[in-house]
């Protein structure tokens, strides 16, 4: 990160606010060069006008697919909020409504790629392959950059011109390499996750091949305008500072995830990944098999928060999901999942997904508070930790 900032001559002038059209915004343009350099892409789009990770993914998909094209997922069903973007669940403005078809190949029971059926699924209309790095609300392992590279190589050998896009949410700075370094054409993510370092108040990014990024820019703004417009308003310094802090913040979040895995594995719960496995994102899944324990866990995470610690999280019908979802996130930035947070759908197997913590110490406190809530309700036997 430091090298990328130095090579692209980041200066104090880059932190100046722009408004209106945002023409000649030095800070915005330089930041996009920093992202491209750091993630090894030809170009980047890093904007506060991209509201969340789902928005960034929808933008990347809709700008690089045309009616008659087919989108294919070789790693099973995508994250819940993308179902309406794609049209798996009907929604206005979906890809399906614009004549883009969708196919998917599920992972094999052992979590490996089903290469035989992936080969069968690729056809003349397959324009873009989407690879979700993180597990989402599933209980499969997160994909390593190495495995993603192997999958992309297999796909490109079958159809060299297919666009391979990686949903990089929760994975930035966890490994030494990023997906663009192993053959991906685009990586997409959110600034209120890893790369924002807990300081970015909003935003998303798309980094990769120049043509793919340009297509996304024209979709975000307007044909003919592209990257030339889009004021950075007053958030640009937090984008830079958050990106600078991101590797350290991610490191603390990883320590918290490992701690959670070890604690809950000793208590007899199923955890993915376990306490000794390699990490490829910041998410720790714990399966409780009942809603009471799942809700108590989230209440403990909320009670450890610096913001809204007095609030009791409750399941609700969150937009984009097909079941009630509970979310614990006493965060400075609403919905920030690089801050201490936990969430999950209230449905079997009642798995909760823990992530974040701007410091390792805060992540540790959150886990201990979650344990306290479970103990108070006799939902766990803490003697197993002795």
Name every feature range the model reports, one short phrase each.
Residues 18-22, 26-44, 56:
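Long amphipathic N-terminal alpha/beta scaffold segment
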Residues 265-385:
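Conserved C-terminal alpha-helix-loop-beta "cap" of PLP-dependent enzymes
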Residues 2, 6-7, 11-14, 22-23, ...:
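Conserved PLP-enzyme active-site core in the AAT-like
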Residues 1-30, 325, 345-354:
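N-terminal entrance/gating region of PLP-dependent enzymes' catalytic architecture
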Residues 39-40, 95-100, 277, 345:
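A generic structural signal for short, non-catalytic loop/turn and secondary-structure boundary residues
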Residues 14, 18, 45-48, 282-287:
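Short glycine-rich or small-residue beta-strand-to-loop segments that form or flank ligand, phosphate
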């Amino acid at each position: 990160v430091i090298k990328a900032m130095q090579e692209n001559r980041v200066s104090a002038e880059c932190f100046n606010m722009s408004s209106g059209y945002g023409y000649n915004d030095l800070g915005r343009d330089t930041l996009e060069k920093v992202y491209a350099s750091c993630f090894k892409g030809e170009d980047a789009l890093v904007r506060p006008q991209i509201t969340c990770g789902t928005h960034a993914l929808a933008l990347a998909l809709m700008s690089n697919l045309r009616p008659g094209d087919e989108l294919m997922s070789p790693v099973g069903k995508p994250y819940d909020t993308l179902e309406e973007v794609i049209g798996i669940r009907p929604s206005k403005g979906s890809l399906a409504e614009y004549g883009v078809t969708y196919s998917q190949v599920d992972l094999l029971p052992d979590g490996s790629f089903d290469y035989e059926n992936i080969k069968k699924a690729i056809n003349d209309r397959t324009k873009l392959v989407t690879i979700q790095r993180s597990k989402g609300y599933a209980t499969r392992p997160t994909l390593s950059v190495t495995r993603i590279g192997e999958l992309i190589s297999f796909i490109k050998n079958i159809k060299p011109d297919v666009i391979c896009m990686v949903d990089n949410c929760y994975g930035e700075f966890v490994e030494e390499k990023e997906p663009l370094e192993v053959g991906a054409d685009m990586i997409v993510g959110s600034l209120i996750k890893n790369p924002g370092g807990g300081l970015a108040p909003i935003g998303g990014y798309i980094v990769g091949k120049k043509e793919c990024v340009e297509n996304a820019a024209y979709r975000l703004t307007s044909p003919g305008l592209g990257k030339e417009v889009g004021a950075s308003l007053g958030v640009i310094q937090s984008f830079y500072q958050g990106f600078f802090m991101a590797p350290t913040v991610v490191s603390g979040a990883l320590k918290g995830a490992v701690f959670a895995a070890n604690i809950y594995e000793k208590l007899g719960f199923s955890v993915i990944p376990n306490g000794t496995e390699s990490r490829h994102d910041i998410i720790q899944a714990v399966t409780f098999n009942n809603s009471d324990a799942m809700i108590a866990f989230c209440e403990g995470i909320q009670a450890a928060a610096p913001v809204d610690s007095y609030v009791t999280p409750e399941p609700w019908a969150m937009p984009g999901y097909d079941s009630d979802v509970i979310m614990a996130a006493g965060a400075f930035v609403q919905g920030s999942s690089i801050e201490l947070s936990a969430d999950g759908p209230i449905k079997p197997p009642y798995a909760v997904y823990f992530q974040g913590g701007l410091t390792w110490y805060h992540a540790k406190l959150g886990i201990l508070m979650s344990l306290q809530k479970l103990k108070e309700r006799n939902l766990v036997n803490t003697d197993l930790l002795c």
